[in-house]
């Protein structure tokens, strides 16, 4: 077993002996990790001069950093709008133009509503695909599921990667999405959206584990590292967002003000 302990208090102003005097008396008299390691090296035949040189090198490193800080020679660098984020702006006062040409929509819709040859689509899903294809006919009306799919498809076609995660995102909790089709005979998966990707873009869509805070935390981190991707986390039901509230409050809402980052 490894027994871990804190030698000092919670911070530089904390005094642990106020509340745990007996334990911290034992800690005070216990050799430090450095002392124990030094004794082990000496037992193994490492010359004392070499051991002392290792200790001195570490002390000098920290002392040099401390002196540099004392002299005001340290400039804090933030990654805000630098590196991978170069070219992004803090404020966009006007709505961006997101419209695409009709023939572009039709090309994407054609891909989204067809399965490859030999792929056995569920009969109800086949009917849904046919219904979506009819939405682009004269007089047709596009529903939410098709509108969402067209938005994703046109973004992928323009070269923007898309990443979606959540507890039932492949199908959609209320069966509105069906971004991934399943062969009824083989269980093979097919994602029509992935076929719309161009210019190096790719689609990632994952049914996640049932830990909202863990998944949203990971996806938030992914969004920091890849600003050109559309990264989406979808709560299975509205109140499931409660499980990820700490990420929403501490990182997403306060991302720029608190952490000088954008997402």
Residue ranges and their predicted role:
Residues 2-263:
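Flexible, glycine-rich loop/tail regions that form catalytic "lids" or insertion modules at the edges
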